[in-house]
Amino acid sequence: PDMVVHASLPQGKETRGARKFLSCLWVSSKSAAISHTVINRFGWWLPPGIWPDEEDQFRRLVLSLWRDGARSFVLNSPWQVGLFTTEMLDDEKASFTAGPFCNISNPATVNVLKDMGFTAAIVSPELGSRDFLELPRLSPLPLGMVLAGCWPVGMSRYGTLGVRLNEPFMSPKHEAFWARQYGENTWIYPAWQLNLSAHKAELEKAGYSFFVSMQENIPASLPPVRRPGLFNWDNSLM
């Protein structure tokens, strides 16, 4: 099914799950502490930047989620399969998707991911239309893509000197951005969102199996920006 990645913990009816899409949460100590009775209703996304001093913590979180019934995981760096045991990876009821931060752009990469135990993959959101439309035909795994939402332009382990978190700041070209802290990393977002929804039918015809919406709690002070959100759709992959 399609995925909706939430930026914060769901409340009330949001914990019941939905038939049309899979609600997903980022793996953290806070998210893993939700009621054990609803953990299996969510997909669980591992952050792309897990540092050596955090590995043991995330390994414990993954094990805890697994014991409570979680079976749908999205890994945003290929090495993260090492956080799972062989028994987990061999479980036929489990799904291990290579996430969009794995920067998947060609079928050779997907072949390697399949050999590593991944069951599906989400391609890089920064491809051009030609590459987007060509990949599913050549892929050995079911493919998904980020269709809409907040996609970061970068992330850093270091602080944002001179920039306040959760408030807009301007680039030298007078483009608005904002930053938010997640764990040890600072994520930097543009004021405009990715939006390829107008091309959904074309992408479905090309062979994409599912689509992803990435939600964020956008700062109220962020100025409105009129941009189509196509990112590199009209460009070629360099």
Model-found features: residue ranges?
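Active-site pocket-lining/capping segments in soluble small-molecule metabolic enzymes
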Residues: 1-112, 116-238
